[in-house]
Each structure stands twice: as structure tokens, then as C-alpha cells.
Amino acid sequence: MALSSQIWAACLLLLLLLASLTSGSVFPQQTGQLAELQPQDRAGARAGWTPMLQRRRRRDTHFPIYIFCCGCCHRSKCGMCCKT
């Protein structure tokens, strides 16, 4: 019984480790690949990156991130800053 529990725990730990290794961000790996490219290939690679980076910067309007109001809007006591 104890051996079975240890095997399950080891398998779970291994799965969690593999999941954490594979779920890393795509950007650091790809930026490392950009550094390895030849100078003439970099311009084409960066041109392909710009739409992806622009999409990444755009905020989802359904889940906005607000900070405390700085008095920038007409309702200065609303608690949410309209500049964010």
C-alpha cells in the first residue's frame, strides 16, 4: 500500500514537473532564436513578430485592469482611473 502511494506521488510529481517545463512562455525561446539568425534574416523575422506583439499589448475590454482614481475623469471619486 505504501509503495503504491509512493509511486502515485512520484508520477504526479513527474507530471507536474513536465507540465511546468512545457508551459513556459513562447517568447523567451523565440527571442533566443532571433539572436541566432543571420542579420539579413532578422528583419524578416521581426516583421513577422510585430502583429503578434501588437495583439499581445491590446487589453481585453471585458476584464479591464483599473488603478485608484487620480482625479483625471469628471467623477473624481469613482475609485477607478480612466487613463488605465
Swiss-Prot record:
One of its GO terms (cellular component) is extracellular space. Keywords: Antibiotic, Antimicrobial, Cleavage on pair of basic residues, Disulfide bond, Hormone, Secreted, Signal. GO terms for molecular function: hormone activity. InterPro entries: Hepcidin. Pfam families: Hepcidin. Residues 25-54 form a propeptide. Disulfide bonds join C69-C72, C70-C78, C73-C81. It is found in: Secreted. GO terms for biological process: defense response to bacterium; intracellular iron ion homeostasis; negative regulation of iron ion transmembrane transport. The keyword Disulfide bond applies. Residues 1-24 form the signal peptide. It comes from the Eukaryota. Interacts with SLC40A1; this interaction promotes SLC40A1 rapid ubiquitination. Belongs to the hepcidin family. Liver-produced hormone that constitutes the main circulating regulator of iron absorption and distribution across tissues. Acts by promoting endocytosis and degradation of ferroportin/SLC40A1, leading to the retention of iron in iron-exporting cells and decreased flow of iron into plasma. Controls the major flows of iron into plasma: absorption of dietary iron in the intestine, recycling of iron by macrophages, which phagocytose old erythrocytes and other cells, and mobilization of stored iron from hepatocytes. Has strong antimicrobial activity against E.coli ML35P N.cinerea and weaker against S.epidermidis, S.aureus and group b streptococcus bacteria. Active against the fungus C.albicans. No activity against P.aeruginosa. This is Hepcidin.
